[in-house]
């Protein structure tokens, strides 16, 4: 609910202040203590089952068998246990494909060709979409006879979502497969029906791996008559091990967050620690990335306090003072600065220092200066946006707003906040990101455009009218409906750029490339489902939080 604007002591007008919903998880995780015996039992069982799965990988001989097993491991959230074995199998498959000139490695059915194409691209190997030409009729359309192959059509649909901009064949594959899946989803039997419905809402390539793993284990695989009981048992034990690990991390982070007591000191700001942590598991869910998850929580909480201070409370004059404090990175010369700004600034600096200590422990001290620079960069961008919103500067062109949005998408600060937790990150990685590569910009703008689509009406009702949608409508004289349609098209094109950029990033370790891909996935999954972000709206995230962190899987 928006409040009326008020005049403050510096003579400026405050923005309409949004009263956010309270935190629904305040005490849920803070007192959690992990049962080391239970966790140890899960770990022992996982290790024993892993040996049997390695034997399965070795025993799989045909390309089809190998691809299905790799895909199943990835859907179940187990592939991180077998990274070396999977990469070796994929290299063998690619060699076979190059000999056969067929993405199925000689198993010439639509399902296997599509599966091979998608998995190979998702692992950053080159493969041409020409492998699908054999399924086209004389007019260049997909043969209608394929529509009776439900699993094949679904596999084609999933493959179409790793396409690049210039791949019109895959554009047609997406249209063709979606049309037929929509027509059959209501008559399919469970669990295939649920699998198709999930794909239509969240194509697998755009889904968040750990979210999908929970869905696949609970709703698909354990109901599949052809399931492998060994894989199912490993998947359930692995998920419960991860769930306990996440609760332990949340307990530690809750204590870290609560010590600042910003809920009472800065009541205008969002109190969303658990929602921030969900982004952490979305970025990298594997156990070895604990510092990635912790770093992202620190980064997101910094972003939220800064965003809500600029966007939801500060006057233009106060925001300028706030920005200058970040530029100086010092409490010196802040006499006359309102207390709430001192509190907000002190939190940001303290949180940064916690990050800096973590970076030192990990031997990644070089990451801290860039993280600091992204905080200062974000302050300048938020300050500029507030001047536009409050009318102290004329409304920007769509191009000027979009350029500022590259920063307020938070792709740079969020990436910087986790770099110390990636073993492969070096100073060269940071230098690469400083050059604003198209791959990073494209992932950031997916999030920014989805946010603008979802927030246009909400922010307009709150008394503000500065979104990319609003700028586009004004500059080009189009309706909101037309602007939103254009933005959705732009998101689709950006995904094609992300796919191409991801596949081309072979000079950088895959864990870094996946980081940016997962940012886009988190944004896409949030906004396509709800037209709002899962951080601000606690009800939207409640179901995901319960499933990932609280509800046990049924064995």
UniProtKB/Swiss-Prot annotation:
Catalytic activity, reaction form: (2E,6E)-farnesyl diphosphate + H2O = tau-cadinol + diphosphate; (2E,6E)-farnesyl diphosphate = (+)-gamma-cadinene + diphosphate
Coiled coil (UniProt feature): none
UniProt-recorded Gene Ontology molecular function terms: magnesium ion binding; sesquiterpene synthase activity
Top-level taxonomic group: Eukaryota
Enzyme class: lyase
Keyword field: Lyase, Magnesium, Metal-binding
Required co-factors: Mg(2+)
CDD domains: Terpene_cyclase_plant_C1
Binding-site residues, (2E,6E)-farnesyl diphosphate: 270, 307, 311, 448, 451
Family matches, as InterPro entries: Isoprenoid_synthase_dom_sf (IPR008949), Terpene_cyclase-like_1_C (IPR034741), Terpene_cyclase_plant_C1 (IPR044814), Terpene_synth_N (IPR001906), Terpene_synth_N_sf (IPR036965), Terpene_synthase-like (IPR050148), Terpene_synthase_metal-bd (IPR005630), Terpenoid_cyclase/PrenylTrfase (IPR008930)
Motif (DDXXD motif): 307-311
Any GO BP annotation: sesquiterpene biosynthetic process
Record's cofactor remark: Binds 3 Mg(2+) ions per subunit.
Residues involved in Mg(2+) 1 binding: 307, 311
Residues that hold Mg(2+) 2 according to the record: 307, 311
Enzyme Commission number(s) of this protein: 4.2.3.173, 4.2.3.92
Pathway in which the depicted protein is active: Secondary metabolite biosynthesis; terpenoid biosynthesis
Residues reported in the UniProt entry to bind Mg(2+) 3: 451, 455, 459
Domains: entry comment: The Asp-Asp-Xaa-Xaa-Asp/Glu (DDXXD/E) motif is important for the catalytic activity, presumably through binding to Mg(2+).
Similarity remark: Belongs to the terpene synthase family.
Role: Sesquiterpene synthase that catalyzes the formation of sesquiterpenes and sesquiterpenoid alcohols. Converts farnesyl diphosphate (FPP) to tau-cadinol. Converts FPP to gamma-cadinene. Tau-cadinol is the major product.
Protein name from the UniProt record: Tau-cadinol synthase
């Amino acid at each position: 609910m928006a409040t009326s604007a008020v005049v403050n002591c510096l003579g400026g007008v405050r923005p309409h202040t949004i009263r956010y919903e309270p935190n629904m998880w305040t005490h849920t995780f803070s007192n959690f203590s992990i049962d080391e015996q239970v966790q140890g039992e899960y770990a022992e069982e996982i290790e024993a089952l892993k040996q049997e799965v390695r034997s399965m990988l070795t025993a799989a001989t045909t390309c089809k068998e190998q691809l299905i097993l790799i895909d199943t491991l990835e859907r179940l959230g187990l592939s991180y246990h077998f990274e070396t074995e999977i990469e070796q199998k994929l290299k063998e498959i690619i060699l076979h494909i190059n000999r056969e000139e067929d993405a199925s490695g000689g198993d010439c059915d639509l399902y296997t060709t599509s599966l091979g194409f998608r998995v190979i691209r998702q692992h950053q190997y080159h493969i041409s979409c020409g492998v699908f030409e054999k399924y086209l009729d004389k007019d260049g359309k997909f043969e209608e006879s394929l529509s009776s192959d439900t699993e094949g059509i679904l596999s084609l649909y999933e493959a179409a979502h790793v396409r690049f901009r210039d791949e019109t064949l895959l554009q047609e594959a997406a249209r063709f497969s979606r049309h037929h899946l929509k027509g059959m989803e209501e008559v399919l039997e469970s669990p295939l029906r649920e699998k198709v419905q999930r794909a239509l809402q969240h194509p697998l390539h755009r889904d968040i791996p750990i979210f999908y793993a929970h869905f696949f284990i609970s709703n698909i695989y354990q109901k599949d008559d052809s399931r492998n009981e060994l894989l199912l048992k490993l998947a359930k034990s692995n998920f419960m091990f991860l769930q306990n690990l996440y609760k332990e991390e949340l307990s530690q982070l809750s204590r870290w967050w609560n010590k600042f007591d910003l809920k009472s000191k800065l009541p205008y700001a969002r109190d969303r620690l658990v929602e921030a942590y969900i982004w952490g598991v979305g970025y990298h869910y594997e156990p070895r990335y604990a510092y990635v998850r912790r770093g992202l929580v620190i980064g997101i909480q910094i972003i939220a306090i800064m965003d809500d201070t600029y966007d939801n409370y500060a006057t233009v004059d106060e925001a300028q003072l706030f920005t200058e404090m970040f530029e100086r990175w010092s409490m010196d010369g802040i006499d006359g600065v309102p207390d709430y700004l001192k509190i907000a600034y002190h939190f940001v600096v303290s949180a940064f220092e916690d990050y800096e200590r973590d970076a030192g422990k990990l031997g990644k001290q070089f990451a801290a200066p860039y993280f600091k620079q992204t905080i200062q960069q974000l302050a300048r961008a938020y300050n500029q946006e507030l001047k536009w919103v409050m009318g102290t500067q004329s409304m920007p062109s769509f191009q000027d707003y979009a350029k500022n949005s590259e920063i307020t998408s938070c792709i740079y600060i969020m990436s910087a906040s986790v770099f110390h937790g990636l073993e492969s990150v070096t100073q060269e990685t940071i230098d690469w990101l400083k050059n604003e590569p198209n791959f990073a910009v494209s992932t950031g703008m997916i999030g920014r455009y989805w946010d603008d689509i979802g927030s246009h009406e909400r922010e307009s009702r709150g008394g503000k009218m500065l979104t990319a949608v609003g700028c586009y409508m004004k500059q080009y004289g189009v309706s909101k409906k037309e602007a939103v349609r254009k933005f959705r098209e732009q998101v689709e094109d950006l995904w094609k750029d992300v796919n191409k950029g991801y596949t081309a990033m072979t000079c950088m370790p895959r864990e870094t490339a996946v980081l940016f891909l997962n940012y886009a996935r988190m944004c896409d999954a949030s906004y396509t489902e709800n037209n709002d972000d899962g951080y601000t709206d606690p009800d939207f995230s409640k179901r995901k939080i319960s499933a990932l962190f609280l509800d046990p899987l049924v064995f």
